[in-house]
Amino acid sequence: MGSKTREKKMTSRPYTGNTDGNHPTERPGTKRFVEFMEYLFGMKSLGIYANRPMRGSASLSVHATWRAVDLKGKGTAKQNADARKAMVEFLFAHRDILGIEEIHAYDGVGCPIPNLTKFGGGYRCDRDSWKAWTPQKNAGTPGGDWTHVEIAPNMADSVTAIEKAFAKIFG
């Protein structure tokens, strides 16, 4: 959202995290969501599924659930940042209808918190707000030039749910 726009508070929703466990088969809604990000914002997927622990933790990564994707814009560093900023602002504005559970802005691109450090910031649905990351509490890749997005299980499992959500947004 632009700097002159107040953050519209939505309803906080439960955060799934990795509670659905390793899911080694593709979730078609996640793939369709990525296709929309590629089409709308010129993103490229850096990966969805990876059965591995989170960075700096023994806990399972949400990538193992087939509900998380890392996205990067194409082109120059500026083009990448501009595309990610537009995408993050869009995802945040439509977070409820799209079932967005978490957004990691490793380098702060698109995050509405001013004066972030190199650790960036993140959005989570259960607090329905952004949080500035610190050297002690961050997502493990400070300054990363990509964006991590997690969607809800019902969206990840359904192409129809994803398509209906985007149809409602662009109605």
Model-predicted segments: where are they?
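C-terminal partner/receptor-binding element of secreted or periplasmic proteins
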Residues: 142-166
